[in-house]
């Protein structure tokens, strides 16, 4: 559980960074930080099942299989994790900034919800 707690702390730090980047109008970087915050929370949840993966797709897929399909978390959480991943790909790898202010705000709000939901669940697992 210590590793899961460390991942949650890192996720919270990344979410704060995403908020600062959004205020600075660095939308691509804000989305990237938000996605990674969500990713770390998904990893923390998977650790409770002694699962660890080396790829983003592996974490996202396993999170869906073990937490969304089983009804532990609502389907919307899985959709938002996938959406954040897709937007992060655009923001990190496209040559021009294609992430809008509105999209970055939406991803940030989804990230907050994702992190709060997973963190609340993790607290109950102790």
Spell out what each predicted region is.
Residues 1-126:
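Terminal alpha-helical segments
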